[in-house]
């Protein structure tokens, strides 16, 4: 379906809007597709899941729907970047999108609150910087597992994301050839 694949932000956006009917349909279609192709995993990737990581009650709802549909387990994976590099990258990206963000104020929020929260009339983003706090809280809320990867290992294995791809693809003959 073109609508489902139109943006890397579509799924997180629908979760944040509590469009659980869309999420259920998306998960159902992908589970059926995986079964039809005799695959053992459905891999969903988006850099925009960070808000769901911070607001873990959304992750719980996502898991509940997936498990109800027949997914056997949910394995969450997260790439953690050096916080200073992450902050500067986010600031540059948001500035390029004409976000009105004061550098000093944003840095203050990161240092004192462990997160950066930005909202507009129709969107809201929350970015975690206090990794220990948010990981602990996420793990307390979810029923699945969480694996974390350093940004450096994520980009330095010949192909960006190779470390994660090798975990998700469980066919030893094909994982290096991907």
Where are these regions (language model features)?
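Flexible, glycine- and charge-enriched loops at secondary-structure boundaries
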Residues: 16, 20, 55, 124
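PAPS-dependent sulfotransferase catalytic core
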Residues: 1-42, 46-48
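PAPS-dependent sulfotransferase catalytic domain
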Residues: 48-50, 54, 63-177
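Aromatic-rich, lipid-facing transmembrane alpha helices and their immediate juxtamembrane interface loops
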Residues: 57-59
